Amino acid sequence: PTDTDTRQQKITTILSTGDTSVDVIQINDEMSTAFKNTGWLEGLNDTVMTEDILDNFAVGYIEDMITSADGQIVGVPGYCGYLSMWVNQEIMDEVGIESIDTLDDFKAFLAAASEKEGRYGYGGSWEKTYVFNEIAQFVNMFGGDYYDWSNEGNRKALEFMKEMVDNGWTSLDQLADKYEQMNQKFIDGDYGVVFYWGTGSEYADAGMKGDDKIHMYKVPTFEKGSIFTDSWSYVLNSASENKEAAYTFLKWIASEDGEAASYNCFDRYPARSDVAETVVPEDNDVKAMYATYAEELEVHGRPMLPQTMEFISEMGTLFQQYVQGEISLDDFCAQAQEAVEANQ
């Protein structure tokens, strides 16, 4: 199923009922968080994700997203993706902004880009199940903790996102927008900067990707420099009756050859840094920026809880109420903390 909730329900049913008809499944971060401590997934520490290859993967992602409470790594990342910042260079040049490296730079660009009628400095995907990514990104940039809504960094992040609305730097029209709608507006020149996953294929297809058009930009440092990585990971159903064959397949997926094949077949950036170094061409516009992300920023998996989709939706609903002025920041923080505790 392509619908997020339906897909997760189907895979939950397969795993929770001990269905032996499926051996290996590829799951996203939301499902990894929901499943990793249930016993439904086979641990891979001694068979696949062994010490000799672990350092080639993003350690923060492995620890945050696919390691169970008892220390078992339950997945093999299929690719490496970042929630990158993308800018429209034409707009940067038009408004005379040369860099967006700090909070002050970011504000200056948003303000300048928003001066043109019908254009906003910042564009988002603020539909209730999508905006979670941006809330968490700003919380990290302001030095907060997504699980602790008494943290001052969290408050600063939410205040800033509301400030963007109040100053006309972003639009409440995007409250229903998912990535498809956001990207179309970005391509059309309606936004100056967005946060988005992937390598920009949508922009390339529209003829709008390039150093002088839309391109990836290093995430600015506010209180700290931080970025999220994501993946879909291959996991082994603990009820599988074909585990030896599955181990053979998963070892290949985790190997240099498997990661290279995944890149060549699916155009997904390799999860292994050593493979990325050798198979991704030097003229690939993403390669240098991904290396910069890995070397200069804190890299984490996204903050998620076992009741993942419920948590994401609840936080999105609260956020929409807050930016529309329906609840106060204090109310948001109190209810956000309740959501954290209720969905653990």
Q: Which positions does each model-derived feature cover?
A:
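Beta->alpha turn/N-cap motifs
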Residues: I27-M31, Y179, Y196-E202
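Long, aromatic- and glycine/proline-rich binding clefts that accommodate carbohydrate-like moieties
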Residues: M65-I66, I214-Y217, N264-T317, Q321
